[in-house]
Amino acid sequence: MDEKTLRSLSPLDGRYHEKTEVTREIFSELGLIKHRLKVEVEWLNYFLNNFREDLLTLEVTKQLDELSSELPDSLALRVKEIEKTTNHDVKAVELALAEQFDGNEDIQSLIHIFLTSEDINSVSYALMLKNIHASTLSWLEDIQLKLKDLAEKNKDLAMLSRTHGQPASPTTLGKEINVF
């Protein structure tokens, strides 16, 4: 056992870390920061497109598109640097995003407009759950299809059922798999 595994918070980031890679990507501190940034960017984009089209220059549109499509790890690291000063995670996200529009005070002043930290956090957590669901759903659907196939193949295979550990009326393996 290596020291990293020994100091893990749980087996999920210790001995099972290889099996939880997708989960860690989404639910890590980095994942949360990136989701917060994404929510801020999408809100700013929505707000500008619906209420301040006059500020949507080609350069601003390009910046928003780039930020929306790929948030670099370096931006998340910048958020953590700012957070040391602000002691506020969402404010740090707001300030790091404002730096991306350096020199454009009009855009900077609209970042986080009409939003609370809870708005950012609740949507970010919802997106994280949606993303983990999407990444695991195909795996679960595969299991469901295999169980359905197994139930169909064994629909006539009689077996003794049990109630509270005691023998009960006969059933079929297919039925029991379907119930499962």
Residue ranges and their predicted role:
Residues 2-180:
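A helix-coil-helix interface module used to build multimeric assemblies
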